Structures are given as C-alpha cells and as structure tokens.
From Swiss-Prot:
It comes from the Viruses. Homodimer. Part of a complex composed of the kinase OPG054, OPG092, OPG114, OPG115, OPG142 and OPG157. Interacts with OPG175. InterPro entries: Poxvirus_J1. One of its GO terms (cellular component) is host cell cytoplasm. Induction: Expressed in the late phase of the viral replicative cycle. The gene is OPG100. This is Virion assembly protein OPG100. Signal peptide: none annotated.
Length: 152
C-alpha cells in the first residue's frame, strides 16, 4: 500500500488511528505527512468550489459553501458536540486501525482522480474560499473597483 493511501485512509476514518500514528512519528515525518494531506484537501476544496460555481451558474445557491451559510456542524445531541471539542490527550500505545472498505476505495479513487485530472496537470496553489464580506483586503479592493466605475 502506498504511504499516501495509508495516511489518507487513517485521516478520513472516524476514529483516533490518525492521532495514534502521528504521535509515534518524528517532527519531520509529521510535517511531511501534513503537507501531503493538505495537498489532497486543497484538491477536494478546489473541486467543491468549482462545483458550487456551476450550481450557482444555473441559479441554485449551494448553501453549504455560500456566503450566507452560518452553520458549520449540525449537532443532534450534546454528545456529538462534546466529541468534537473534547481534546483528550493522545494515547500512543493503542493499535492503529486501517479501514480497507469503502473509505479505502474512496482514497484510491481520489488519488487516481487527482493524478489524471486536468486540474492536477498544473501546479495547484493552495485553494482558499474567500468570503468577501469578512476579508478586509478583498473588501477594500472591491470598494476601489466600485469607486472607479466609468459612467457612460
């Protein structure tokens, strides 16, 4: 199994295997692994933003990525909230589990798609979603552009 497949499968799994793995690595390996993960997350974010733009081009507002969307996580009970924000110290003596089911298939498909995608042929700069109402620099640029409108 490729190291990136192993890493991404642990990262996307809903357990603490990723943290157990990370706790056993040295700093240089950890930073390298984080860089690999962020490259794939940037690719996924790029796909999501392009998909959102396609939906908006046909008049559908995809709420999850729109500027007006306020809710990041839906909590059905307080236990979900507690699990998300409870920062329990990492135990390194546990076993790392690797899901070789659908999650592993997803990771392999993601890696293949990134490799064969036209998006991946050019170097992907880190993709970030900018909310123009909250980004001061972007808002200032937009104000300058609006004030320089040429009237006919």
């Amino acid at each position: 199994m490729d190291h990136n497949q192993y890493l991404l499968t642990m990262f996307f799994a809903d357990d603490d295997s990723f943290f157990k793995y990370f706790a056993s690595q040295d700093d240089e390996s950890s930073l390298s692994d984080i860089l690999q993960i962020t490259q794939y997350l940037d690719f996924l974010l790029l796909l999501l933003i392009q998909s959102k733009n396609k939906l908006e081009a046909v008049g559908h507002c995809y709420e999850s990525l729109s500027e007006e969307y306020r809710q990041l996580t839906k909590f059905t009970d307080s236990q979900d909230f507690k699990k998300l924000f409870n920062k329990v110290p990492i135990v390194t003596d546990g076993r790392v589990k690797l899901n070789k089911g659908y999650l592993f298939d997803f990771v392999i498909s993601l890696m293949r798609f990134k490799k064969e995608s036209a998006l991946a042929t050019t170097a992907i700069d880190p993709v970030r979603y900018i909310d123009p109402r909250r980004d001061i620099a972007f808002s200032n640029v937009m104000d300058i552009l609006k004030s320089n409108k040429v009237e006919k």
